[in-house]
Amino acid sequence: MTCGSYCGGRAFSCASACGPRPGRCCISAAPYRGISCYRGLSGGFGSQSVCGAFRSGSCGRSFGYRSGGICGPSPPCITTVSVNESLLTPLNLEIDPNAQCVKHEEKEQIKCLNSKFAAFIDKVRFLEQQNKLLETKWQFYQNRKCCESNMEPLFEGYIEALRREAECVEADSGRLAAELNHAQESMEGYKKRYEEEVSLRATAENEFVALKKDVDCAYLRKSDLEANAEALTQETDFLRRMYDEETRILHSHISDTSIVVKMDNSRDLNMDCVVAEIKAQYDDIASRSRAEAESWYRTKCEEIKATVIRHGETLRRTREEINELNRMIQRLTAEIENAKCQNTKLEAAVTQSEQQGEAALADARCKLAELEGALQKAKQDMACLLKEYQEVMNSKLGLDVEITTYRRLLEGEEQRLCEGVGSVNVCVSSSRGGVVCGDLCVSGTAPAVNTRVCSAPCSGNVVVGTPNACAPCAGAGACSGGCKKC
């Protein structure tokens, strides 16, 4: 069994083996974190007991001391070991304790920077892909042929339709404005009538109150007068009846003078009954007069109430008409505002359409001008190309003529050399951009002396002549001194 403990940078180990097994050496090292045991000065201490075997102590690489003992008849004990206290003191390695934290922070920062760098790389790749995509789109749009479309008739038709709609809206707005004016005039008339009716109603109510007071007073006076008249009438009737009775009695008394009649002049009249009867009559008359007055008053009140109800109904109808007119005015005002807004929108749309049409027309004109310029340039380029082509064709024709002339000259020279003809002078003139004409003249019978070629631009002819004269120069006098004769 092996046990290890760390204390102050040193390690102590002890090993014991029990049983009949051979002794084994146990080497222990005292490691220090981050430092190899071979560079440190730390040492280890170990002890070993072997039962049934003996092995001498040995010193290992860990600077430990070992001792061996024999387990036999001796008591099982561990020998005393001396320890150097200086070895137990911690070593001053001058290492910053925050170095590990700093290294960890540096590693984290490096990881963060690596992550940011990877993100930047991904972003750069994405932007490169976007750039490639945009370049592809740009090339596609550059290579795509733009189709010419004549949009001017469409815009003109649309603008004309909008103008017709605007005219219809203007006509509707004029009609609605006239209707609004008519409705406002009607409303003013109804308002004046309503105000007049209100003032008339107030005047009528005041007159009704005054008349009611007068009627009440007149009714009371009439009742009093009727009662007085009734009483006076009854009293007059009563007095008349009394007078008639007395007159009749007197006449009968006068007519019967010869007859002595014993009369009882004590008029035995029951005045209480007469008064009670008259009072009853007066009460009856008063009650009938009161009933008639009440019935008349109720009739008048009913008539006045009916008049008030009729005027109230008329006023209610007038108010309903006024409210209806107000609602109509509000509706017409809203319709007019809506028509104005729609007219404004249509005018704005017409203006915008006109602007867009003008812009499209201007753009079309610019494009037409550009196309005309490009067409003119293409025509000029074509004319230049045709001119160059004509010049090239002329040059080709001249070269063909020269080649033909040279071939004839060579054939003639070969024939002359073969036949032994006299000397031949050759004068060649080339013309740039024109048709070259050549005159071939062979003369003389003398042996061949020399052959001369005049390559100067004399008159545009290729001439073969005698050695005495250059035919083109002699004929026209236009040689520039290129030939020897001239």
UniProtKB/Swiss-Prot annotation:
Domain IF rod: 106-417
Region (Linker 12): 253-269
Alphabetical UniProt keywords: Coiled coil, Intermediate filament, Isopeptide bond, Keratin, Ubl conjugation
Covalent link location (Glycyl lysine isopeptide (Lys-Gly) (interchain with G-Cter in SUMO1)): K212
Transmembrane segments: none
Superkingdom assignment: Eukaryota
Descriptive protein name: Keratin, type II cuticular Hb6
